[in-house]
Regions:
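Cell wall/extracellular polymer interaction/catalysis modules
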Residues: 1-39, 57
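Basic/polar, cationic surfaces and motifs that engage anionic cell-wall
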Residues: 1-7, 11, 41-60, 75-158
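Alpha-helical scaffolding within the catalytic cores
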Residues: 61-69
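Short glycine/proline-enriched loop/turn "hinge" motifs that connect secondary-structure elements
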Residues: 68-76
């Protein structure tokens, strides 16, 4: 699968893991988890206490070489990243999201303009409930710095 974009989502739940989302999706009659990555918030199970060690963990979902099931009309050309939560995300989650997107941009030669929120493809969605414009601006700054430093440390070879 040729990856042309990354699409960020939220789980619209206060807790969860990639395994839990896989179960939820199967209960809806789907073929398992539709996202390729899940970023946890420290609440794995409903009603259980927060676990700081489990906050901001990037879990694998659907294999990256398989077409996702997360954004109608864009699944064949994108990877889906789901943040556990709805409107508020922890610092650990935001750091993990940026690190994951930076890595995927490097692997797939993507630019900030190739990273979207689900709401940008579906007027009925607000997911991931964060400003993707601000995220892309920060991503662009970080990508530029990474690429400049990589070029400098590798003798100009990229």
């Amino acid at each position: 699968m040729e990856v042309k974009k990354l699409i960020v989502h939220c789980s619209d739940s206060s807790f969860g893991t990639s395994e839990e989302i896989d179960r939820w999706h199967k209960e809806r009659g789907w073929n398992g988890i539709g996202y390729h990555f899940v970023i946890t918030n420290g609440f794995f199970i409903s009603g259980k206490p927060y676990n700081q060690k489990q906050d901001g963990i990037v879990q694998k979902g659907r294999s990256v070489d398989k077409v996702g099931a997360h954004c109608r009309r864009h699944n064949r050309s994108s990877l889906g990243i789901c943040m556990i939560g709805k409107e508020h995300f922890s610092d650990a989650q935001r750091i993990a999201l940026m690190a994951t997107v930076l890595e995927l941009c490097g692997v797939h030669e993507l630019e900030p303009g190739d990273v979207y929120g689900h709401y940008e493809f579906d007027d009925g969605k607000s997911c991931p409930n964060m400003s993707m414009g601000v995220f892309r601006e920060d991503l662009g700054f970080r990508l530029k710095n990474l690429r400049t430093n990589r070029s400098y440390t590798s003798g100009g070879k990229k």
